[in-house]
Amino acid sequence: MRPWVPVTGASPHAAVGPAWTTGRRCVGVVTTWWWSVSYVERQVQIIDSLYRAMDASAENGYTDAACRFRYLPEEDGSLGIDSSFFYTIGGVSVSALLNDYGDKGCADLVYDLHDVMYKDIRFGESIRSRMCPRGVNPVPSAPTAPPAGLAAFPSANRRTERCLVWIACVHRLSAVGEAGSLNEPEAARLANDPAEHSNRHVDALGRQQLVCAHVVAGVASDGFGVRAGEERTGARGRHSGSIKPLDNLVVETPIEAARSRHRCAGRPCPRRHRRPCNASKSHRPMRMQQRDRGWTVWQKDFSMLTPLSAGFQHRVLAQQLVARRGRMQPSVVQIGVGRIRADVAGRVAGQDALGRIGRILPNAVARLSIAVRFLRAQSINHSIQSKRDRRSWNGCSKGQRRRGFISIDKKPGPKNKLALMFIREPDRFISIDRNPARRTSWL
């Protein structure tokens, strides 16, 4: 696939940094001059703009999908997430709460990342059916046309504006209730309960949109999710064997996505390079920097993501999910926050609200990265791949390929214990406020 190419004028920041074009030697140049603006001031402006846009959407009566969130640093330096993700899809309110790790399995709320991001989906049944929990039939409800002030934007610009800036934070989302499922009486009660609805709604697909938490649980190339406890067999596409969602939980950095996409014309690199092969232009993979330094690059560059680089990374992630020759992909769970476009009144609502949080919370990001790296090792060790695909992975020795690219799950040590602690006790890393009363008074 071609690298992500922005549409000129699609964003107020489209002129920041170079445009990504096909054949560019280094696609990861990051410009940082505009980070000199005070973080606190910009954060306040961005959050205020977000809420103004949400209010404008609510005033137009457009409440087909809603999302509320806030990311705040805690006093102890951890990543505080005062969040509950509220959706009203087809008249059913679904509150996706950050859930602790246990045996509850993956979320029932399955979201098709590729279709929502890159296909011209109109406001209708396709998105509602994907976002509804299993067992809850989408009910025809709110108007399926965007507000009048948003109809003029062409779909191409809408797709390119849908950039993600995402943090390496492993979490689970479940539907309303600790059990993670909605029965019909409960859904009906929530649909008619005003207390369950926020007055700050934002259209999940519109131009003034906030890219809400994307949950991709067991996504394969055909775009279908694997529900908790289900086994995926070779019934659709070229899947073989079965998939256990917990074993396939991974958050993949742009660096890892670029490295795993490297193929050297479909065979192992003849020189067995530990880094991606630069022998010819056709062999050169997409990557953020000329030198691939793995997790060091990710942790350093996390605080310097421009909207352009964010869009490129998300493009790589989408390719990783949906364009890998029909093979079952590792599950990806991510918190993603995109920019919202100009709202109905024409105000520019700002950039990403999350991209600079690593700048002030380096310890939290590092701790999460360790946990993510452990989960990536677990995922690859248990993922279903053919022998040919394992051999074609570059950037590691034969023994590492045999064990699954990286194998820190085989080596006991403090990082391993930290990762296991993150899985078992996520509240020590992410503060979760489950009190509904406090969720309604953020500003």
From Swiss-Prot:
- One of the GO BP terms on file: cell wall organization
What pairs make up the disulfide bonds? none
Is the Cytoplasm keyword given for this protein?
A: no
* Source taxon at top rank: Bacteria
* First-listed, main subcellular location of the protein, grouped into a coarse class: secreted
Instruction: Give the keywords, sorted.
Output: Cell wall, Cell wall biogenesis/degradation, Secreted
Q: Where is the composition biased (Basic residues)?
A: 263-286
> What are the boundaries of the region Disordered?
263-292
UniProt-annotated location(s): Secreted, Cell wall
Q: Name one GO cellular component term.
A: extracellular region
* Family to which this protein belongs: To mammalian CGHB.
The name on file for this protein is: Chorionicgonadotropic hormone-like protein
